[in-house]
A protein has these predicted regions:
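Secondary-structure end/capping motifs
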Residues: 226-305
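N-terminal secretory signal peptides that target proteins for export/translocation
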Residues: 1-11
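Periplasmic-binding protein-like
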Residues: 40, 109-119, 197-227, 231, ...
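Bacterial N-terminal signal peptides
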Residues: 14-27
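Conserved C-terminal helix/tail region of periplasmic/extracytoplasmic solute-binding proteins
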Residues: 295-332
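Short, glycine-/small- and polar/acidic-enriched structural segments
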Residues: 32-178, 182-188, 200-211
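Ligand-binding clefts/hinges and TM-proximal coupling segments of bilobed small-molecule sensing domains
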Residues: 142-157, 161, 237-270, 311-313, ...
Length: 332
């Protein structure tokens, strides 16, 4: 029997279903990830928290699609606004800030000098470096600034040696082995490779117990103001990555293999253990570490004489995460 009412109801069902679907969809949060670029300045293990955040899927989990790039101009690209975040040393970002730029460190990985001064076998003591060639990453880099900070402790200045821009750690190791340089500052665990090649550890900077802000997560004050939620989510990913470093060797080592471009399990494990032992669960940057950097820079940059170390750090977002109990909850 034909029933007009039934036909009308049937026609209305798809419309009703579509309306309900639209209401549900409109109520769902947007999962479109923020697309950003992030720089890291070296392939040393203390840069690895960023790598673990990527490989561990933590950035995308927090709504961030990041293109992570290795560049020797990490601070320049950050200051220019070409990237939103950078993994770099306190000395690298401090030089830019002292010259009027606005970078700030929002999380710290390393707060003491740990490099080894590695030399060819014929060099037996620090005094033997006089007149010799020492390789650094590039002028103004962490390896350069740390070297000129340490040399005066042993009666040497940068004028007593020839400093050569050689490149990152792999290039410095090759230059050492080939004899084109006589010594170089090498971050652990890569000094072990130098030892295996017959080089001598002339100085372990860790023995000096010098507070010095090494690698950390850096952004700009512009980003903290204009993209604060993005910065909050990025830092959350970073803190979660530290948790993975502490508790998940498998994912962490996968990240090290990818970004250090090696399949050598011994090298991967050495690098991973270095980061695991160095990074703190609550990565507050070191005010004392920045104080050392600024004092050292005062001879080269006039603005350093009146600079306040606290101005180089912004822990407001880290304190939010900490006080909320988020960090402690990761380790329960």
């Amino acid at each position: 029997m034909f029933c007009p009412h039934s036909l009308s109801g049937t026609k209305q069902l798809p419309i009703l279903a579509l309306s309900v679907l639209l209401v549900i969809v409109s109520a769902l949060p947007s999962f479109a990830a923020d697309k950003i670029r992030v720089a890291f300045s070296a392939v040393s293990p203390t840069q690895g928290v960023l790598w673990v955040a990527d490989v561990g899927g933590l950035l995308i989990k927090n709504g961030i699609s990041a293109e992570i790039v290795y560049t020797r101009a990490a601070i320049e690209t950050l200051v220019a606004g070409e990237v939103d975040f950078g993994q770099m040393t306190g000395s690298l970002m401090s030089s830019a800030r002292l010259q009027g730029a606005d970078p700030v460190m929002i999380a710290g990985v390393q707060d003491i000098l740990e490099d080894r001064l590695v030399a060819r076998p014929n060099i037996k003591a620090m005094e033997d470096l006089r007149g010799k060639r020492i390789g650094v990453f590039r002028f103004g880099s962490a390896s350069h600034l740390r070297l000129i900070y340490v040399l005066p402790r042993y009666g040497l200045s940068n004028r007593d040696v020839t400093l050569l821009q050689v490149g990152d750690t792999p290039e410095r190791l090759i230059a050492l082995a080939g004899g084109s340089i006589d010594a170089a500052l090498i971050s652990p665990p890569d000094h072990l490779e130098a030892q295996r090649a017959g080089m001598k550890i002339l100085l372990n900077l860790r023995d000096l117990n010098i507070a010095y802000q090494g690698s950390g997560l850096v952004t700009t004050q512009r980003v903290l103001v204009r993209k604060r939620d993005l910065a909050r989510r990025f830092l959350k990913s970073y803190v979660e990555a530290i948790h993975l470093v502490k508790t998940n060797p498998e994912i962490s080592k996968k990240a090290f293999a990818k970004y250090r471009q090696t399949k050598d399990e011994k090298r991967i494990d050495d690098a991973y253990q270095t980061l695991r032992e160095t990074v703190k669960t609550k990565p507050y940057p070191s005010i004392e570490g920045f104080k050392t950097i600024i004092e050292d820079a005062s001879e080269r940059i006039p603005a350093a004489k009146t600079a306040n170390p606290k101005d180089f750090i912004d822990v407001s977002l880290l304190e939010e995460l900490d006080k909320s109990g988020f960090i402690d909850a990761l380790y329960r």
